[in-house]
Amino acid sequence: MGQQSLIYSFVARGTVILAEYTEFKGNFTSVAAQCLQKLPSSNNKFTYNCDGHTFNYLADNGFTYCVVVIESAGRQIPMAFLERVKEDFNKRYGGGKASTAKANSLNKEFGSKLKEHMQYCADHPEEISKLSKVKAQVTEVKGVMMENIEKVLDRGEKIELLVDKTENLRSQAQDFRTQGTKMKRKLWFENMKIKLIVFGIIVALILIIILSVCHGFKCT
């Protein structure tokens, strides 16, 4: 999938961003901050669409985790990424200085961790997708509320999301489809392997029964 599919991420306490990371230039940071101001209190997971990108949020215990991704990356991987970041952040700062930290004061400590999580999720999309299905605490992605970002920001004009895109970024949609095809092929081979093993066991059992009844090959 490539790390370019994950554009920007941050951790905030309320509306105060404590740590953030991106390798791109654009207005997505200010758009994400504006969306943070408008998050509904009725749902702890929320996704906004804007100009081929999604702004994904996870709120938990007074903290909000956000990641901006290209739309072709889907919704499962960004939500799984946010769960990973939340778990890591809670282990490091649960009940600690994060509750009183100032804006961007955790950039040096946790900014690099955001980068690591972004890289890992980008490099292991199949593993992340499988884990997100298994974990009980991760609700199905289809349950995440969706809303047009223009409504959230109360603007009449269309928002043009500015992201400094590279050639690699423009090819991410094709990369994502390729990963899906490889995963389907791998699952098909695994399924066939299981069927062949079961078939072999059945044949072996039949031969054992025949040999035991016939005392070898001397059936009359």
Swiss-Prot record:
Residues 10-114 form the Longin domain. Residues 1-196 are cytoplasmic. This is Putative vesicle-associated membrane protein 726. It comes from Arabidopsis thaliana (Mouse-ear cress). It is found in: Cell membrane; Early endosome membrane. The chain crosses the membrane at residues 197-217. The lineage of its organism: Eukaryota, Viridiplantae, Streptophyta, Embryophyta, Tracheophyta. GO terms for biological process: protein transport; vesicle-mediated transport. Its main location: membrane.
